[in-house]
UniProtKB/Swiss-Prot annotation:
This is 16.9 kDa class I heat shock protein 2. GO terms for biological process: protein complex oligomerization; protein folding; protein homooligomerization; response to heat; response to hydrogen peroxide; response to salt stress. The keyword Cytoplasm applies. Keywords: Cytoplasm, Stress response. It comes from the Eukaryota. It comes from Triticum aestivum. InterPro entries: A-crystallin/Hsp20_dom (IPR002068), HSP20-like_chaperone (IPR008978), Small_HSP (IPR031107). SUPFAM superfamilies: HSP20-like chaperones.
Length: 151
């Protein structure tokens, strides 16, 4: 059994029991001075699921163009997803009432398991959802060799 943190934007009670670390996440950008970059990094949340055939990673990247995202494998087994959410052009006559969408650079790293076929990684960005598929190598079944008994 594994524990997976899930969120539901449609649940009106989802924020009733807040994550105690959310406060920390909101304070850190203010202290470090890296507000928008840290916010963009925090918003690049990804799911990783394993199927019998592959490891599948998904990230919601609304408004990010394919040219603004990089998917790489470094050090032989580390999947790196990085990119930049560009800031909307501001007009000096505009009066902002709320800014909640983050902008800046983001990067996520995942150490892949031994069964990952890193030479066959595929990625696609459709409707603001990045999907990275890392096929798995076939598990070789241990060979059973019958030994003749003499005598």
């Amino acid at each position: 059994m594994s524990i997976v943190r899930r969120t539901n934007v449609f649940d009106p009670f989802a924020d009733l029991w807040a994550d105690p670390f959310d406060t920390f996440r909101s304070i850190v950008p203010a202290i470090s001075g890296g507000g928008s970059e840290t916010a963009a990094f925090a918003n690049a949340r990804m799911d990783w699921k394993e199927t019998p055939e592959a490891h599948v990673f998904k990230a919601d990247l609304p408004g990010v163009k394919k040219e603004e995202v990089k998917v790489e494998v470094e050090d032989g087994n580390v999947l790196v997803v990085s990119g930049e959410r560009t800031k909307e052009k501001e007009d000096k006559n505009d009066k902002w009432h709320r800014v909640e969408r983050s902008s800046g650079k983001f990067v996520r790293r995942f150490r892949l398991l031994e069964d990952a076929k890193v030479e066959e990684v595929k990625a696609g960005l459709e409707n603001g959802v990045l999907t990275v598929t890392v096929p798995k190598a076939e598990v070789k079944k241990p060979e059973v060799k019958a030994i003749q008994i003499s005598g």
